[in-house]
Amino acid sequence: MTISMFQCLLIGLWTAFCLAGMLFGIYTNRCLVMAAGVGLILGDLPTGLAMGAVGELAFMGFGVSQGGSVPPNPMGPGIVGTIIAITMKDSGIDVGSALALSFPFAVAFQFVITATYTFATTLTSYAYKALDKKNFRGFRIAANATVCVFAVVGFIIGFGGAFSSEGLQKVISLIPA
C-alpha cells in the first residue's frame, strides 16, 4: 500500500493535533486515539483500532514516570506502528510485529519531545518580559507559542513517518525473520 501526499498531510495534521492536545490534558496523545485517526485516514479503521489497543496494553505501565526517568512516547506505536501495520499488512506484518518495530521510534520521539520541552522553557521569559512591558499581545503569543511549537513538531513527526513509509518498508524487509 502506498500513502498519498494528501494522506501524509492529514496524518501530519492529526499528529500535530494529538501532540498539542497533550498540553491541554485532553488525552489525544494516547495510542488508541492516534492509531484510530491514522487508521481512519488510511482507510483501515479495524487495524488502526487493533494497533491502538495493543499499544495501550504495552504502554499501560508507562502512565507515570518514576523519578527522573521518562518512558518512551506513545507516538511510536500510535502513529508509526499503525502506519507499519496498515501498509505492510500484505507483507505478513501483524499488529504485534508492528508494535515491536515501533518501539525504537517511541524512544527516539521521546528524545525529540524532551528537546522540545527544553526549548519551550525559554519561551516563558518572553512572556514575563511582555507582561512587564504591558504588552498583552506579546504575552498571548509567547504564552501560546509552546502549543504551536509542539504542533509543528507533531506535524513533522507524522508527515515524516507517513512520507517515509516506503523506505521504512525496505528497511524492515532487510531484517532477517
Positions of predicted regions on the chain:
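Helix-loop-helix junctions within the multi-pass membrane cores of secondary transporters/permeases
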Residues: V95-P176
